Design a protein with these regions (language model features):
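Solvent-exposed soluble domains appended to multi-pass membrane proteins
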Residues: 1-235
């Protein structure tokens, strides 16, 4: 979520200047997603396949149900459609391959390769220690784009650096961006942590755009968020 859409927050500076610049200069909009606070895989499934989660069971994750069935050899997706016209198709994600059974799901959705955390040189983690930072994804995304010669590529890159949980204690000693306005100290600490993590993601976006531009190949970058954070937002 854009922190400026949270009407009670005040921030020392804009945490996502790259995003706001893109928002002002390129096509943007709101994406309706099927989950809140968790369930990234179901947003992915809807975006990649065009199938609505309302036709599945309550609490179901197709990655872990239909896509694991032996009688479901494949599911049509953006990846399979682009593959059919000659694209190389790749996934890059700085989390474990087996989370949400992505290692199985992506192959059935038409992706040629899946570079997960296990195949990366991870050297930096978020202040909570829970997740790798997203900066590693810049080089890994470019590597996926460079992996094929004389071929267009579709690369689906999934970030994890701004993922929850968001600690109620203050664990960033000197935050780049300070936050005030939440109902209590614990909530304020959570929001300050979240804001600084999406600031890091914004830096990743800027660095990715620079890296892609340096390649000198016509490229379209599309970004979307998976769900709102678990922060007690009601409207």
């Amino acid at each position: 979520i854009d922190p400026y859409d949270v009407n009670f927050l005040q921030m020392s500076e804009d945490p996502i200047p790259t995003f706001h610049s893109l928002e002002q200069n390129f096509t943007t909009g709101y994406l309706t997603v099927p989950v809140v606070g968790a369930g990234t895989a179901n947003t992915e499934f809807e975006v990649l396949t065009g199938m609505s989660m309302q036709y599945f069971g309550t609490g179901e994750y197709p990655y872990k149900t239909i896509l694991k069935q032996s009688d479901c050899p494949s599911v049509e997706s953006i990846a399979s459609d682009l593959s059919s016209i000659g694209y190389g198709t790749h996934v890059v994600h700085n989390n474990t391959a087996t989370f949400y059974s992505r290692n199985n799901a992506f192959s059935k959705m038409g992706f040629d390769t899946f570079t997960s955390k296990e195949l990366m040189n991870i050297t930096e983690y978020t202040p909570s220690g829970s997740w790798p930072t997203d900066k590693v994804l810049v080089n890994e995304t470019v590597k996926a784009m460079d992996a094929t010669e004389n071929q267009s590529d579709f690369v689906y890159t999934i970030t994890v650096g701004s993922h929850g949980d968001y600690p109620t204690e203050k664990i960033i000693e000197n935050p780049e961006i300070t936050v005030t306005g939440a109902a209590d100290e614990a909530s304020n600490n959570q929001w300050e942590y979240y804001v600084n993590m999406i600031h890091n993601t914004d830096n990743f976006i800027a660095n990715l755009i620079d890296a892609v531009n340096r390649r000198g190949e016509d490229t379209i970058i599309v970004m979307f968020g998976d769900h709102l954070p678990t922060m007690g937002l009601e409207d």
